[in-house]
């Protein structure tokens, strides 16, 4: 016997982001708000939702520096899985390499820092094309000294 839980996305994300959640016609989204503005939470819920609802795609999450991945976007993705009430046993969750793979379809969330060009240029998934890229803390990618 399977027990399913219904989760309302509208109860998980703020109204400002609800209209863009399932809009596949929007190709680029830049989320703006202040601190604690739920940008990372929205991105995690969107990525986790896409992971389980699209059997043919994967997700890449990037931060400027590797050393901040585990405590930020990786942790937020795990929190998103909990908020969507998806049992963690449905995923292979690894820290090295840092990935979250949905067992049912093989769709994966890949995590990478962008400390150097070599860190991101090889992220390819032959079986599940990357359909969503999340740049967490976008402003870090455009520091004045670079």
Predicted regions and their residues:
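Short, flexible loop motifs at catalytic/binding sites
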Residues: 1-146
């Amino acid at each position: 016997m399977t027990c399913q839980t219904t989760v309302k996305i509208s109860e998980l994300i703020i109204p400002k982001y609800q209209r863009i959640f399932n809009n596949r016609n929007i190709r680029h989204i830049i989320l703006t708000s202040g601190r604690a503005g739920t940008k990372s939470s929205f991105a995690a819920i969107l990525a986790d939702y896409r992971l389980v609802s699209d059997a043919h795609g994967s997700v890449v999450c990037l931060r400027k520096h590797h050393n901040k991945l585990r405590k930020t976007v990786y942790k937020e993705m795990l929190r998103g899985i909990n908020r969507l009430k998806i049992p963690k046993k449905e995923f292979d969750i690894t820290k090295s390499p840092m990935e979250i793979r949905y067992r049912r379809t093989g769709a994966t969330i890949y995590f990478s820092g962008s400390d150097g060009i070599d860190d991101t240029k090889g992220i390819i998934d032959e079986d599940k094309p990357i359909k969503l890229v999340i740049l967490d803390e976008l402003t870090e990618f455009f520091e004045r000294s670079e």
